[in-house]
Amino acid sequence: MTSELSDSSPPGVLFKVHPSVQDFLLSPPAYKTRHFAQGQSHHDNPNFLATGAIVFDRPLHSVRTSALKTPPRILLVQRAPHDSMPLLWETPGGGCDDDDPTILHSCARELKEEAGLDAISVGPLVRCPAASAETATEESRGKGEFELAEAIGCHSFFTRRGKLVFKFYFILEVKQPANVLVDPNEHVAYLWATEDEVRHKRIESEGGKEGVELNFTTEEQRSVLLEAFKQWNNYIVE
């Protein structure tokens, strides 16, 4: 994993862009046309694109400049009780809008809307482990959409209405201090979780605070968080 960022942002982009995600500097419709045009592939094409914002509690570039006295933590938000998948935990994120300038803007916009944080850099991509194919229904196996998602590193899933979604996860650095402000219409709480806490799906009680069970929206959500920690740890030892 590299921390290098482009020296200058493309026109109209207010955040730094990691070199590995230049391909996502396309509007959602343009990205779908380039990669999933009808007749270009035998795979089922996604109906919608979505993004997830993975935010650590410290800038990546600070890892090598100071001793890590505490393990890194990732931001999680808890879904509102009146929404689908009530009270489950996830990263900030959501669907790409067709009028978003680029997919990276979609991710930064969702982070701002759901957590009140301003992105200052976007990328790298966190490739989703091959979990979608494992959890696919028997009716969906072999049709190609899960194999395609695995190949391009995203999480694929079907909505309750049967629409196929491809979701990309990016590591984002944010303007400091990171004062999280959730939208109560979508989320009711937030917390910062370590790798061990994500792995064991629990934050133990400490200092009089009750422990928290980390019940995630999907197993893929948890898997991609562990992959993000893996990228972080690989960067430390490079």
Q: Which residues does each PLM region occupy?
A:
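Intrinsically disordered, low-complexity domain-flanking/linker segments in eukaryotic proteins
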Residues: 59-71, 124-148, 197, 207-210
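A generic fold-level signal
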Residues: 16, 43-48, 69, 83-84, ...
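Residue-level signal for short segments within beta-strands and strand-turn junctions
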Residues: 55-57, 78, 173-174
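Acidic, metal-coordinating catalytic segment for phosphate/diphosphate chemistry
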Residues: 2-66
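Nudix hydrolase/Nudix homology domain
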Residues: 2-6, 162-163, 167-238
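Conserved beta-strand and immediately adjacent loop positions that scaffold enzyme active sites
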Residues: 52, 73, 189
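Active-site segment of metal-dependent pyrophosphate-handling enzymes
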Residues: 116-178
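Conserved Nudix-box catalytic region and its N-terminal flanking loop in Nudix hydrolases
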Residues: 65-114, 126-132
